[in-house]
Amino acid sequence: MTRLSAPIKASMKKTATALTLACSLLSVMSISQAQAADNIDVSFQTILQQERNWAGLQSKSLKVGDITWSYSEGGSSTKPTLLLIHGLAGSRDNWNRVAHYLTTNYHVIIPDLPGSGETIVSQDFDYSVPNLAEKLRRFVEAANLKGPIHIAGHSLGGSIALLYAGQYPFETKSLFLVDSGGIFRSANTIYLKDPTYLKQLLVSKKGDFNYLLKQTMFNPPFIPKEFLQAQEKLMINQAPQTQKLVDQLIALNKVYTPDSFAVLTKTIDAPTLILWGKQDK
């Protein structure tokens, strides 16, 4: 993986600056109590759609093989393409407030990963990181995204982005990793050292989402109760798929060592920016 030289830093300035300023907003959506309608599900979806509109995004779908991908697209297709990959138990909407800063200068593509958001897969789907990276490549090809493209990944999305860039180095223009998952020599959190701890973060019953926020945010923001309930309900519904993803991460950690994981990414030659906050877990 290359380090950034001065010329490369200059060429990445717009992408890196916009992403760095915006990434702190991942997974946080500020809404007022007045926006919460009696019908929580309808209100929640309405708010998400309002955020997509505000970010300049349109909801689209694309069938590739046996997967019907749900994704957001914004910006002119004549601009450089930027692929944003969400994290574990997340969805494309985690990037809405980030995308707001990007759609003016980039062709932004944000898919729901298989088993997340509105991208539905079969019960026997292989949730391994290598397979997710391969399926993502098939999506990029079917969407006719002209490479090389910029790729940003958060959490699990960072692991997928790493493998994608390693397998398709000539199709990757730059790489931006936010709190990336993976198997590293200098892992500094319990979740990277031992993914079994991720099971503690599964949202499978009422009350779990509050625990998740406390564990994953240094200073959790105020979120109206109606929004919390709607988000928790969605995550409970997706708990079986999230459990399978966690199981695959645990299996990956047993199969690969830091050295063997590094081999998977040794062909990455794209300029890479890694962001990890002081309090991030």
Where are the model-predicted features located?
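Alpha/beta-hydrolase fold catalytic core
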Residues: T2-T81, T104-Y106, G147
